[in-house]
A protein has these predicted regions:
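Targeting/processing segments of secretory and organellar proteins
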Residues: 2-3, 19
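Cationic, low-complexity basic patches in intrinsically disordered or flexible, solvent-exposed regions
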Residues: 13
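Conserved N-terminal beta-strand and adjoining loop/helix that marks the start
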Residues: 23-46
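Active-site-adjacent beta-strand/loop module that shapes the phosphate/pyrophosphate-binding cleft
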Residues: 33, 95-115, 125, 129, ...
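Conserved Nudix-box catalytic region and its N-terminal flanking loop in Nudix hydrolases
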Residues: 41-79, 172-178
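Nudix hydrolase/Nudix homology domain
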Residues: 56, 122-178
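A short coil-to-beta-strand element that immediately follows conserved catalytic motifs
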Residues: 84-92
Length: 178
């Protein structure tokens, strides 16, 4: 098993063997998975944090080894904003095709706790949806926020490149059987 860090302590190269048609094939994977949540409160405001790196965004972060997506999201929101949430829906996913980073987006309901900052959030606040659209400026974060706020009951998937930001492929899917 190799270790190709590329700057992220959680991004490790893992070699696995799979059996296809009776044969053994070695495949190297270096994917990193993150989760993010659009958190609504009882006033239909959404939670934004001010990241030192990307400016205003919704909370989220890395899926750590041994965690489910849901556990990771609940932990990240608590760490970054100090609040407890209930995950209410799956919104979609996107992939950075240059760095094999997969981002998974959920909707959440605020259930308790006091807003507080952390080393990953210089500011934390509840804002109206329209205000949020003006505050978020990082291109990928803005694209994902537009999708999160669409409320069209579809699952959104897209691939992108980051420098310069551009959508490579995009598709929306109906939820359930069609």
């Amino acid at each position: 098993m190799g270790n190709s860090n590329r700057g992220c302590p959680f991004l490790k190269q893992t070699e696995i063997q799979i059996g296809i048609f009776g044969g053994k094939y070695k495949m190297n994977y270096t994917h990193f998975v993150s989760v993010a949540g659009l958190v609504y409160n009882e006033n239909e405001e959404i939670l934004l944090i001010k990241s030192p790196w990307r400016g205003w965004e919704y909370p989220g972060g890395m899926v750590e080894p041994g965690e489910t997506f849901q556990e990771s999201l609940i932990r990240e929101i608590k760490e970054e904003a100090g609040v407890d949430v209930e995950i209410t829906g799956f919104i979609g996913l996107c992939k950075n095709i240059e760095k094999d980073i997969v981002n998974i987006d959920f909707s959440c309901k605020y259930i308790g706790g006091e807003l507080m900052t952390s080393n990953e959030s210089a500011e934390v606040r509840w804002v109206k949806k329209q205000e949020a659209l003006g505050m978020v400026t990082f291109p990928l974060t803005k694209k994902r926020l537009d999708i999160m706020l669409s409320e069209d009951n579809r699952v959104h998937c897209f691939g992108f490149k980051k420098e310069p930001f551009g959508i490579i492929a995009e598709q929306d899917f109906m939820v359930g059987k069609v």
